[in-house]
UniProtKB/Swiss-Prot annotation:
Protein family: Belongs to the bacterial ribosomal protein bL34 family.
Record's GO cellular component terms: ribonucleoprotein complex; ribosome
GO molecular function: structural constituent of ribosome
Keywords: Ribonucleoprotein, Ribosomal protein
Region of interest called Disordered, as start-end residue ranges on this chain: 1-44
Matches recorded under HAMAP family: Ribosomal_bL34
One Pfam family from the record: Ribosomal_L34
Entries under InterPro entries matching the protein: Ribosomal_bL34, Ribosomal_bL34_CS
GO biological process, one term: translation
Organism: Streptococcus pyogenes serotype M1
Name of this protein: Large ribosomal subunit protein bL34
Amino acid sequence: MKRTYQPSKIRRQRKHGFRHRMSTKNGRRVLAARRRKGRKVLSA
């Protein structure tokens, strides 16, 4: 059986990247929460 995680930089950015987070209300909420928590990296 093959592994379920087959990394792809493009898919990673499109689904979890900064611009994708900014494109939705909830995504912006995620970024705000990560800023509030003091995360060094906000998104993929």
